[in-house]
Amino acid sequence: MSEDLAKQLASYKAQLQQVEAALSGNGENEDLLKLKKDLQEVIELTKDLLSTQPSETLASSDSFASTQPTHSWKVGDKCMAIWSEDGQCYEAEIEEIDEENGTAAITFAGYGNAEVTPLLNLKPVEEGRKAKEDSGNKPMSKKEMIAQQREYKKKKALKKAQRIKELEQEREDQKVKWQQFNNRAYSKNKKGQVKRSIFASPESVTGKVGVGTCGIADKPMTQYQDTSKYNVRHLMPQ
């Protein structure tokens, strides 16, 4: 999903650049100004959607680790760790420690869910429980914890689906507006006329290729000069 959103974001930015280029020559065009505003809004929406998921877990991890004292952990230790699905702290057991990367593989007690988390995010069980009690959170039963996690995941999924729906609607609206803008620009060209290059081949055998002067100083088209007398054959000995 992130890859698709990144592609859409690049597409929106490219469209915005084209609209801004068009506005440089027609800055009062209301349609272009509205299109620019809409594109800016959908770009911000896409950026927000891309950054929402990782920021939630990161914020929870940072706040949890900020009060984390140093502790020497070993395999088999009980600890309090953050579950990435809801950002809440639960009791877990250390299964493996990676000293090089500063991480630990843990399993949440009573659930069996395994995760790899930074060692700095772990707390001794008693300290973790006390921190939760001090914050006004009473220990919950296993059934209550499962119900809370399920409800959180459900709300998060609904919110995510709604944001995706809004983004898709914005994308469709922009597609229609962009097509209308292109059609209007195309229709302004006179029908039946084809722009020709000043260097295009003449349509008749008597036509000549020249460089137009655009009417400057009433000068005519530059005329073809016969340069045959300068042919190298005239310089060869007879």
From Swiss-Prot:
Q: Does the keyword Translocase apply?
A: no
Which InterPro entries is this protein grouped with? SMN_Tudor (IPR010304), Tudor (IPR002999)
GO annotation, biological process = apoptotic process; mRNA processing; regulation of alternative mRNA splicing, via spliceosome; RNA splicing
User: What are the entry keywords?
Assistant: Acetylation, Apoptosis, mRNA processing, mRNA splicing, Nucleus, Phosphoprotein, Spliceosome
Is-annotated flag, keyword 4Fe-4S? no
Where mainly found? Answer: nucleus
> One MF term in GO for this entry?
RNA binding
- Gene Ontology CC entries for this record: Cajal body; cytoplasm; nuclear speck; precatalytic spliceosome
N6-acetyllysine modifications at: K219
The domain of life for this entry's organism is: Eukaryota
Q: Where in the cell is it found?
A: Nucleus speckle; Nucleus, Cajal body
Q: Which residues carry this modification: Phosphoserine?
A: S201
Self-association state and partner proteins as the record states: Associates with spliceosomes. Associates with U4/U5/U6 tri-snRNP and with U2 snRNP.
- Name the family the entry cites: Belongs to the SMN family.
Its biological purpose: Involved in spliceosome assembly.
Q: What protein name does the entry list?
A: Survival of motor neuron-related-splicing factor 30
The gene it comes from is SMNDC1
